[in-house]
């Protein structure tokens, strides 16, 4: 199972958009690979619609979506057709037809529940590194806005060398400010409060993102 900071495992897969190499075909782009237990199930259907409703928001931040389950491609295709015909939502992102080997490699098989994959989420960066891993039980649908927020804050943290507070940009303590990494020596700690940051103490300083 890939851990944070690992290279995402090289996978050659079949999808509803044709063959794909993951993460090779995604290099240079952020991506969210999310698994679902099975096609033609209610919670999964609501999740796919919710992801599709946010495709443009993910694209705007340079992030691609890829679905996955242990179902065959023809099942994925038929399910996508059903969603279009009955819910008037056109699923535009690819869906991987995984097998047990791939699912086990990613740690996505639910113990005691056969070949149904758990609701896993992997966020990969443009270098193919695993940056975030989430697992949800079969009974609970995911919060797509939180996944979108997580990708955004990872990008901001990388670009600005800052840490992001809880619930950013709506943190109750520091609102939309970002956190300055704590000083790592005594001299820097002394200087920290002299710099133009808002500080509760030398180890807890924050600032506006654009400052």
From Swiss-Prot:
It holds the Pfam family 1-cysPrx_C. Coiled coil: none annotated. Residues 2-156 form the Thioredoxin domain. It is found in: Cytoplasm. GO terms for cellular component: cytosol. Substrate binds at residue 119. One of its GO terms (molecular function) is thioredoxin peroxidase activity. It catalyses: a hydroperoxide + [thioredoxin]-dithiol = an alcohol + [thioredoxin]-disulfide + H2O. Keywords: Antioxidant, Cytoplasm, Disulfide bond, Oxidoreductase, Peroxidase, Redox-active center. Disulfide bonds join 199-205. It comes from the Bacteria. PROSITE patterns: THIOREDOXIN_2. Its EC number is 1.11.1.24. GO terms for biological process: cell redox homeostasis; cellular response to stress; hydrogen peroxide catabolic process; response to oxidative stress. Thiol-specific peroxidase that catalyzes the reduction of hydrogen peroxide and organic hydroperoxides to water and alcohols, respectively. Plays a role in cell protection against oxidative stress by detoxifying peroxides. The active site is a conserved redox-active cysteine residue, the peroxidatic cysteine (C(P)), which makes the nucleophilic attack on the peroxide substrate. The peroxide oxidizes the C(P)-SH to cysteine sulfenic acid (C(P)-SOH), which then reacts with another cysteine residue, the resolving cysteine (C(R)), to form a disulfide bridge. The disulfide is subsequently reduced by an appropriate electron donor to complete the catalytic cycle. Homodecamer. Pentamer of dimers that assemble into a ring structure. This is Peroxiredoxin.
